[in-house]
Amino acid sequence: MILYYIIVPLAWLVFNIGFRVRCEGRENLKKIGTKGCIIASNHISAIDPVFIVITRFWGQRMMVFAKKELFEINPFLSWFFRCAGAVCVRGTKEEVGAIDDTVKKCKEGGTLLIFPEGTREKENAFLPLKSGLFVVAAAAGVDVVPCRIHYDTPDGRMKPFCRVRVVYGEPMPAARFSMEGRRDLRKLRENKQ
């Protein structure tokens, strides 16, 4: 949607002024080239997707897996999140269709942002990974780029006007995720039909 291509550059301007966003490891994104990929990031704050999208944006729309509750706040926000590339995949009957559509777009060169822990971190501790990352990586056959967001504050939490570092790691081949992902995708299809 055209709205995406207006919002992202404006967000880049506002958030770079307000938060002094720094991107490290951009060369790892360039290794992907025009192929599709999955960016798998930690999740500290509700605003994390914005920082990742503005450091990755090159005129290409990014998809973001988002929890169901975000789409239930009100109809305007639901519409806005969909325009911004959010894909609702949790607890809905359309989950299989949404995943199939996301896989297709990744195969065609699209980028998916996913938070493999499934929720925001508490107290800077890593949480167990959910299966969504493995499912999409296996089905799409695209590389996974690890990403880490750092808020330069004493407690590592997002504060207004703090410095933000978005760090991209070396791409990991999809083959590393394929066995577990295919098993999870099969389970998902069996449960949803």
Predicted regions and their residues:
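Helix-enriched interaction subdomains in cytosolic or periplasmic regions
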Residues: 1-11
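Soluble catalytic domains of membrane acyltransferases
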Residues: 8, 17-188
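A conserved mid-domain beta-alpha-beta active-site/ligand-binding segment of alpha/beta enzyme cores
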Residues: 193
